[in-house]
């Protein structure tokens, strides 16, 4: 068991030991020569170099590994690298550009959402029905009220006629009484007032639509003192 473990360690050192030593050198990047041929990059030292050839030397058009530090090639100043030829003039973008793009998109979404919300609130909201203004017309009110007044006053016509007939009969009776009183000598009785007729017009301020029936207006009688020694008959019993 121990012999098998020692054999594995030996094989690993033989496989990775020299390669690990070679990985300590510089890396020569790929380049394009004068004829336009591209050469792949390699790690110093290469398989055919000595172990101390860990520095990338030469020129931009021809690169190799060497051990002299003064012959070291500054690969950063070369412009014939393949990536420089494929993408000439490309510079690194600033770090804040992606954040600026994301922020602009976010602000655009906010503005668009606000516009859509305002449109939905103003245009898609159901409109309330407008109320018609109530217009009051005096003429229409009088037209509607006049039939009601006429119908309410029509049943009173017989009573007015009866009152007129009653007043006429009472007037006639009073005239007869006063005529009888005049026949007695020595009694002075004032003449009765003239009966009210329809020929006498009474001007009353009344609104249109109302009917005023003619009424009997009784005139008061002034009593005169009786003469001494004379008696007047009493007609109250009649």
Swiss-Prot record:
Residues 151-173 are annotated as: Disordered. The keyword Protease does not apply. Its main location: endoplasmic reticulum. Pfam families: Shisa_N. It is found in: Endoplasmic reticulum membrane. It is a single-pass type I membrane protein. Residues 159-173 have a biased composition (Low complexity). InterPro entries: Shisa, Shisa_N. GO terms for cellular component: endoplasmic reticulum membrane. GO terms for biological process: negative regulation of canonical Wnt signaling pathway. The chain crosses the membrane at residues 99-119. Disulfide bonds: none annotated. Residues 1-21 form the signal peptide. The keyword Endoplasmic reticulum applies. Keywords: Developmental protein, Endoplasmic reticulum, Membrane, Signal, Transmembrane, Transmembrane helix. Plays an essential role in the maturation of presomitic mesoderm cells by individual attenuation of both FGF and WNT signaling. Belongs to the shisa family. This is Protein shisa-3 homolog. It comes from Homo sapiens. The gene is SHISA3.
């Amino acid at each position: 068991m121990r012999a098998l473990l020692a054999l594995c360690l030996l094989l690993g050192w033989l496989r990775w030991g020299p390669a690990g030593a070679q990985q300590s050198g510089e890396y020569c990047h790929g380049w394009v020569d004068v004829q336009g041929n591209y050469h792949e990059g390699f790690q110093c030292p290469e398989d055919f170099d000595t172990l101390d050839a860990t520095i990338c030397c030469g020129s931009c058009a021809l690169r190799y590994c060497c051990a002299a530090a003064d012959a070291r090639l500054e690969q950063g100043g070369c412009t014939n690298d393949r990536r420089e030829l494929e993408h000439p003039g490309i510079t690194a973008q600033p770090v804040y550009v992606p954040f600026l793009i994301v922020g602009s998109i976010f602000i655009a979404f906010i503005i668009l959402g606000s516009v859509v919300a305002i449109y939905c609130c103003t245009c898609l909201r159901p409109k309330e029905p407008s109320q018609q203004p109530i217009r009051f017309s005096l003429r229409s009110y009088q037209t509607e009220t006049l039939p009601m007044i006429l119908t309410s006053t029509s049943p009173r016509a017989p009573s007015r006629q009866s009152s007129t007939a009653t007043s006429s009969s009472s007037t006639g009776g009073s005239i007869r009484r006063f005529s009888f009183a005049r026949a007695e000598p020595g009694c002075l009785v004032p003449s009765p007032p003239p009966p009210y007729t329809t020929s006498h017009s009474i001007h009353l301020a009344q609104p249109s639509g109302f009917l005023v029936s003619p009424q009997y207006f009784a005139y008061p009688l002034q009593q005169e003192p009786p003469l001494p020694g004379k008696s007047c008959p009493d007609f109250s019993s009649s």
